[in-house]
Structure formats: structure tokens, C-alpha cells
Amino acid sequence: MLTVREHIDISAPVERVFDYMDTPAHQATITPSLSESVLLERLPNGGSRARYTYRLLGLSFSGEVRATDYVPNERIVWTMTGDLQGTIRWYAEPIETRCRFTYAATYRVPGPRFLQSLTGPLVRRYNEREIRTLLRNLKERLESPRAAG
């Protein structure tokens, strides 16, 4: 299993950051390698079930995410199934009038087990870069003058 974790401070209220991230269609607009994120249903816990298509190192991976822990304006924990398997955790923490948003993921490195020791470090670096870009894109989108209101 591989775990990556990054955070960013955003000059926007927690509610706005959480609402934006809670919309599955927004994920493909801020995540470079995510080509599709489609809402399948809203769950009884308030979270979502969504379908994803992710491109990693020239390969296409698809599956579903399901919000298994959903606390509005605080956190969403996703279980990821399909070609990629693991857990994604989002935390939104208020800091005065801003939000500290944390993205953490734990997942299996795809591919045959005997290659994972070789591909693991490459996949880790790729995903660390992907998450940093996602967080920068989220910050830019929510702090832009067009995002006000």
C-alpha cells in the first residue's frame, strides 16, 4: 500500500471549499489525470457514489468511489474500487476566514506484485505531483475573482 498526503491553505470559507469538492464533476476540472468523474447517486449518509476514469503513465483506470464517512464542512472519506483500490480522505479545517484542505490517499500500486517494488517509487512521485497540482488548481479556482460569491 502507498500513502500520499498534502495540504494547502485557501482564502475561502470552509463551506465553499467543501461544497466545491463535494461535487464529483469538479474533480476532473482540477485533477490533471482524471478524465471523468460522474455522480452516480447521493447516498443516505449525504455523500456520493461516483464513477471515475483516471490516466496514469499512459494507462487508463476506471472504477467507483463511495463516500463511507461524510461530515459536512469537515471531511469525506472515500472507498475506491475498480482498477485502482484504496481510500481517499479529504479534510477541511477552518483557520480564521480561510480553509486548510488536506488530501490523503492510501492505495495499492497497480500492476503485478513482482513489479511493484520498481513501479512503487515512480507511482508515488507521480501521485505526489498530481495531488500538489490538484490542490494548487483548487486554490486558484476558489480564490479567483470569478469564484467570489
How would you label these PLM feature ranges?
Residues 50-56, 75-82:
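Short beta-strand segments that buttress and anchor functional surface loops
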Residues 1-45, 137, 148-149:
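Hydrophobic ligand-binding cavity/cleft-lining segments
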Residues 14-15, 42-45, 68-73, 91-100:
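A short, structured loop/turn motif at beta-sheet edges
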Residues 6-8, 39, 63-69, 87-94, ...:
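Hydrophobic/aromatic beta-strand elements that line small-molecule binding cavities or substrate pockets
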Residues 79-133, 149:
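Beta-strand/loop substructures that line and gate deep hydrophobic ligand-binding cavities in soluble
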Residues 59-71, 76-79:
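Helix-adjacent hinge/juxtasegments
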Residues 1-7, 49, 62, 75, ...:
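Intrinsic-disorder/low-complexity, polar/charged segments enriched in Ser/Thr/Lys/Arg/Asp/Glu/Gln
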Residues 55-61, 109-113:
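Short, cysteine-centered beta-strand-loop-beta hairpins and adjacent loop/turn segments enriched
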